[in-house]
Structure formats: structure tokens, C-alpha cells
Amino acid sequence: MNYRVQPTAQVADTAEIGAGSSVWELAQIREGARLGEGCVVGRGAYVGTDVRIGNNVKLQNYALVYEPAELEDGVFIGPAVVLTNDHNPRSVDPEGKQKRGGDWEAVGVKVAEGASVGARSVCVAPVRIGRWAMVAAGSVVTKDVPDFALVMGVPARQAGWVGRAGVRLVERDGEPGVWECPQTGALYDEKDGALTERAV
């Protein structure tokens, strides 16, 4: 075994965990879940059945990732974040009978490469969090988030752009639609509500 699982964690026999990953106390990884290499699953975090997680992903303490979520490489899920999976949640059907597993269809949240979801945020499925986007702490995401977008609030709304470093981008003086990372100097172009990286 080339990964670490704490004794109080529960990992299903059919789950796959990549090399160099760590699963901390009281975490639960369900049947068929697949985690890539170098992942960290924090204390009390939950990974649902058949969830797909890429390499170098961090799930902080008490994050809840319900199936059929998909997290690409380099994703950060903050403490107590919830990725939901039921668009019309009910305990009972219209006749008052308790709903069972086959009585509803799970829908997932997709989090693209490098994106971050801040502490105690809720992503209401089905939504996609774009590449390198950032969801501010405490937000409720009900719509897709564009690549590199910074969103915040309830419901979450775009409040700017961020680069790969996670720092808010600044629009260059005299160059409308050209954004720069103050930390790395990387340049980005905005067109029709989308942001793209300039080739280096």
C-alpha cells in the first residue's frame, strides 16, 4: 500500500486510492470512488459512491462530495464545502412514502482543473466550476462558473477574475480586456464574458 489511511477512516474495498494520497481520521470513501495520486482527504470528509477525483486534489475537513461529482487535477475543496447531488430533494414521495435509492436521479457537480471552492460553500448540482475559478467562502453556487472567474455571495455572482496563482487579476491601464496577475505577471484576454490565458 503506497498511500496512507488513518485507522478511524472508512475506505470501501472497491474504492481506488492513488499513490502518495492521505485519508485522515473519520473520513469515508464509498464504493467505486476513485482518487488520483497525491490527494488529501481531510478529517470527517465524505467521498460518495463512484466519485471521480484527479491527482493532487485537496478535500479539507468535513467536505462532502456526493456522487456523481467529478473533480479534475489540482482542485481545492475547502472545509465543510458541500457538493450536492439532488436537484429536487424530498424525504417522501407525493403519497407520503419514504423515498429509496431508485426513487431519484443523482446529478453531479463538476469541478475543473485547478479550481478552488472556499470554506462552507455549497454547490447546487448540476453545476460546473470552471478551470482555475475561485468560489469565495460561504457562497451558494447555482449556475455554472466560467474558467478563471471569481464568484461570491448568495447566490454566487461574478466579482472579478483570478489567475492560476489564485490572486485577483487587475485590468491593464489603457488595454481594455487585458488582465494581469500581480503576482506572476501572466496575461489574460477577456472576450465575450470569457477569459483565456495568453501563450507564454
Model-derived segments and spans:
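Short cysteine-rich clusters marking metal-coordination/redox-active sites
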Residues: 163, 181-184
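Flexible, glycine/small-residue-enriched loop-and-beta-strand segment within the central core
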Residues: 1-7, 22-128
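Cys/His-rich microdomains that often coordinate metals
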Residues: 158, 167-170, 187-188
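Short linker/helix segments within small regulatory modules
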Residues: 171-178
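Cys/His-enriched microdomains
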Residues: 158-161, 179
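Short Cys/His-rich Zn2+-coordinating modules
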Residues: 56, 60, 96-98, 117, ...
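Short metal-binding segments enriched for Cys and/or His
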Residues: 187-200
